Amino acid sequence: MKLRDEKAPWVERDTLVEASPEEVWEALTDEDRLEEWLAPDVELDPVEGGEIAVRDGDEERAGTVETVEEGERFAFTWSRPGEGESFVEFTIEALPGGSRVTVVETPTQSAATNTAGSTAMAAGGWDTRLIRLGRAMRFTPVA
């Protein structure tokens, strides 16, 4: 099944964090950790076919987990009610002293309503989220 529309505008952002790939993986796949940087209210079943729901104020997105490769790659589709769906993929690369986290968001083939403007908004959103992820990785909560 082809999820991404290769001709559609896309967003790619990355950041370096002072954390192991295992720590980053937890931040990407644990509801409590996601709430530290992605959105205040996250529900996630981190298995292929599982559901994801993200709420931040009046904004809500829901989707399906598509790829789970522990410690390396995590991907899902999500959409807001009445808007096109997009495919979000995180990859983790181990580096000396930390990890590189890359996120790519691409409209799916069913997302004919996506425009260059919505792509620019997505890019700004990921810039902010990755800054928050970096901060969350420095302040790992103690159980």
Predicted regions: what is each one?
Residues M1-E43:
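Hydrophobic ligand-binding cavity/cleft-lining segments
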Residues W10, P81-T128:
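Beta-strand/loop substructures that line and gate deep hydrophobic ligand-binding cavities in soluble
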Residues W10-D14, P21, E51, E60, ...:
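Intrinsic-disorder/low-complexity, polar/charged segments enriched in Ser/Thr/Lys/Arg/Asp/Glu/Gln
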Residues A19, A53-G57, S118-M121:
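Alpha-helical scaffold segments that form or flank carboxylate-/histidine-based iron centers
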Residues P21-E22, E66-G71, T91-R100:
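A short, structured loop/turn motif at beta-sheet edges
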Residues W25, D127-L130, G134:
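Non-transmembrane alpha-helical segments in soluble domains
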Residues E35-P81, F87:
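Glycine-rich portal/gate segments that line the openings of hydrophobic small-molecule binding cavities
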Residues G134-A143:
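Short, highly charged C-terminal tails/helix-capping segments
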